[in-house]
Each structure stands twice: as C-alpha cells, then as structure tokens.
UniProtKB/Swiss-Prot annotation:
Belongs to the MetA family. PANTHER family: HOMOSERINE O-SUCCINYLTRANSFERASE. GO terms for cellular component: cytoplasm. It comes from the Bacteria. Pathway: Amino-acid biosynthesis; L-methionine biosynthesis via de novo pathway; O-succinyl-L-homoserine from L-homoserine: step 1/1. Keywords: Acyltransferase, Amino-acid biosynthesis, Cytoplasm, Methionine biosynthesis, Transferase. GO terms for molecular function: homoserine O-acetyltransferase activity; homoserine O-succinyltransferase activity. This is Homoserine O-succinyltransferase. Coiled coil: none annotated. The record marks 192 as: Important for substrate specificity.
Length: 308
C-alpha cells in the first residue's frame, strides 16, 4: 500500500518519477482501510527536500500511511516558501490533541548550540513529553536523537573536533532485534554531524539497547526495549548528492571542511558518489513501521494516553 499525501504536494511528482507508489488523499478516501497515522516533525531548513527523503523511506511497505507534515513554530524557514508551509504543514499546537501511530522527528543544523540556546527548545521539550502520551513509536534522527536522549535521560553530547561526514560501515550488534531483521552483518550509512554520545552512555540507560554501531561513528541505531523510542544518529534518508551539496556549500562559504569519507570514488569530487546505503535505509524504516508501529499500535489511538 502507498503513503497518502495531499494531492498538490510537490513531493508527489518526484516520488512518482521514481516509480514510488503514492496515493493522493482523494483516492485514498475511497478505501475502507484504517491507515497508519504518521507525523513528520520537520526541523530542517530545506523542508521540501527533507519531505521527499523521508516520504521515500516510508513508501516501501504494504501498509497504507497517512502522513501529516508538522512545523514546530511559526517562524518562516529560510529555504522553503511560506506558501508551501501554509499549504501543507500543520502547526504542532494544531495537532496536539491528535494521536499518531508513528512520529519522525528530523535532524536540525543546531549541533554547535547548547540546547537552551535553541530558539524552540522549550517547545521541543513539550513535543517530547507529548509524544509519550500521543505516539506509539517515535523515531528521532541525528540532532533530534541527541536532544531526546538529553531530555529523557540527561545524557549530553560532546562536540567532535572535526565534523563527522561520509559513508561509514556499521556492525549489527543485536541480530535478533526486529528492527535489524534482514540487515547484513555489516552495512553502510551516511553521517553528517559534530555531536556525539558514546556507546557507553547509551548502554548506561536502563531499557535502551545499541543495535548498530561502528568504531568511527559510535552508536548508530539505538532503541528502547518497549519499541517506543528509536534513536538514529546518522542520515539513512540522504539523497546521493546530499553530502556533496553540504561539502560544496561549506567550500563556497570560505570554510575548510574535510572531504566526506568513503564517498567520492578515489576521493575525487568530480566523480559522482557510489551509493551504498539506500537499501538498508529503506529496510530500517520498513522494519520500524512493521514491527515497532503496526504490530504494537492500538486500533483505538485514544488509548495511547494510558501507556505514558
């Protein structure tokens, strides 16, 4: 089954061109199926690009999914037309009474700021507490993963001396966990971050398990034993050219970024990257939707408040 998105959302034409089955809301309304309700709290500056990346990952399951795009505040994003935000996004306050089967909280380019200096940190804390009562399973990406661990368990990130950027090999640490079902023992994923929380810090929290990690990146996929919280410290959603765009953006800005590791063939930016992460990225989200969301969510979402 497809993801359900608004008929006029620009992401629809991009996904259709990639042969991804997308159903607009008009057609979906004719089917007598209770779709999964999934929210995407999009914290990235380029909302439209991020929408496509996560919608692509949500599309590869037999489940019908109704997607709400959510903004955390009314501040106009720098790289997205306000007309797009008004047409396709809901303010968090407007969905605060709703329950969701799943919620994705994206990353944000805020690694160099203390949490208390993030302009929407107080609202972010409200969202994190709200999700405990309104969402069956929440997946936090990159910055959001660190922010959630800090809020819930007081584990603060440290800043690396140099940005971690590139494609890195990871090892599955718990092959029996359903989130890792079908994964190769070693698989690749993109990272682009300054912040890091040690494997030991994750493992020190009762009820959390590190499911995949590497010596270079540290913990990559971490999940709570009750399947309600998933922390992904990298970017499995990234497009083939995402790291290339970041690298060239920083060069243009007069910075001296390190070249993304294991990304360009022969470390030559003139060559397109060899994509080695998309299959496992898709599998991660398929497993999350199936085993952590669909097989655990109540039919009556209103009962989620009893799980908090």
């Amino acid at each position: 089954m497809p993801i359900r998105i608004p008929t006029e959302l620009p992401a629809q034409s991009i996904l259709n061109s990639e042969n991804i089955f997308v159903m607009d809301t008009d057609r979906a309304a004719m089917q007598d199926i209770r779709p999964l309700e999934v929210g995407i709290l999009n914290l990235m500056p380029n909302k439209m690009e991020t929408e496509v990346q996560f919608l692509r990952l949500l599309s590869n399951t037999p489940l019908q999914i109704n997607v709400d795009l959510i903004r955390i505040d009314n501040q106009a994003p720098k790289n997205t037309p306000e007309s797009h935000m008004k047409a396709f996004y809901q303010n968090f306050d407007d969905v605060a009474d709703k329950q969701y089967d799943g919620l994705i909280v994206t990353g944000a380019p805020l690694a160099l700021l203390d949490y208390d200096d993030v302009k929407y940190w107080q609202k972010m804390k409200v969202v994190l507490e709200w999700a405990q009562r309104h969402v069956q399973s929440t997946l936090f990406s990159c910055w959001a993963a660190h922010a959630a661990l800090y809020h819930f368990h007081g584990k603060n990130r440290r800043l690396r001396d140099e940005k971690l950027s590139g494609i890195f090999a990871h090892q599955v640490k718990d092959e029996h966990n359903e989130l890792m079902r079908g994964f190769d023992p070693v698989f690749h994923a993109p990272h682009s971050r300054y912040g890091e929380i040690s494997v030991a810090d994750y493992e020190s929290v009762e009820g959390l398990s590190v499911l995949a990690s590497s010596e270079k990146t540290g913990a990559y996929i971490v999940a709570s034993d009750d399947k309600r919280l998933v922390f992904v410290t990298g970017h499995p959603e990234y497009d083939p050219d995402s790291l290339d765009q970041e690298y060239k953006r920083d060069l243009k800005a007069g910075l001296t970024p390190n070249m993304p590791e294991n990304y360009y063939p022969d470390d030559d930016p003139a060559q397109g990257p060899l994509v080695t992460w998309r299959a496992h990225g898709s599998l991660l989200f398929t497993n999350w939707l199936n085993y952590y969301v669909y097989q655990n969510t109540p039919y009556d979402l209103a009962s989620l408040s009893n799980k908090a």
